[in-house]
């Protein structure tokens, strides 16, 4: 009956949210701003509709045919030895669609090796994170646009590596007459 189905659905949703609360997080570099402009605007710009391809790293629905043939390169010397960069190419797909390919990286510089008993070995370790992305967006109407991105992830610390795959989905609304935009993205 309907009551049992609802109970099972609620139990399933609660179980999913509880299992995700394990106290650790992977690929935290995905939260870093990918451009100097996004960083200056607070780090995450899911609703800003501009002809700036770097914004699609935050919301794939911000990609549009108006960005046809654009190349975007960004580099930031973040804090200390941390370097952040991105590269992106976008292309129109008909009148209502667009696609793009891009990559982001973070290099954390040299990290001094310290053993669990606080002994400094004198050796240095390197750490880096890389994301290679594919994007696609489509105008859903005159004011609404949807977008998806697929990310291949690599993370390395000394001799340890990890790879992953994740998807972003976004929606963007823009009313040019009123200068109003709204957007949201489901990330990673």
Model-derived features with residue positions:
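Extreme N-terminus of proteins, especially the signal/transit-peptide cleavage junction
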Residues: 1-2, 19-21
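Sec-dependent N-terminal signal peptides
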Residues: 5-16
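Subset of outer-membrane beta-barrel
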Residues: 21-187
């Amino acid at each position: 009956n309907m009551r049992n189905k609802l109970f099972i659905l609620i139990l399933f949703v609660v179980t999913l949210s509880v299992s995700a609360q394990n106290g650790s997080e992977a690929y935290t570099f995905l939260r870093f701003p990918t451009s100097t402009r996004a960083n200056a605007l607070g780090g995450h710009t899911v609703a800003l509709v501009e002809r700036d391809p770097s914004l699609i790293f935050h919301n794939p629905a911000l990609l549009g045919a108006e960005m046809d043939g654009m190349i975007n390169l960004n580099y930031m010397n973040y804090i200390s030895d941390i370097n952040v960069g991105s590269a992106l190419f976008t292309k129109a797909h008909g009148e209502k669609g667009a696609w793009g390919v891009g990559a982001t990286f973070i290099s954390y510089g040299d990290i001094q090796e310290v053993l669990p008993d606080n002994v400094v070995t004198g050796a240095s370790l390197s750490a880096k994170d890389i994301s290679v992305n594919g994007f696609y967006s489509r105008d859903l109407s005159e004011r609404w646009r949807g977008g998806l991105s697929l990310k291949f992830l690599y993370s390395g610390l000394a001799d340890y590596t990890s790879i992953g795959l994740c998807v972003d989905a976004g929606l963007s609304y823009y009313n040019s007459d009123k200068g109003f935009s709204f957007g949201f993205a489901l990330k990673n």
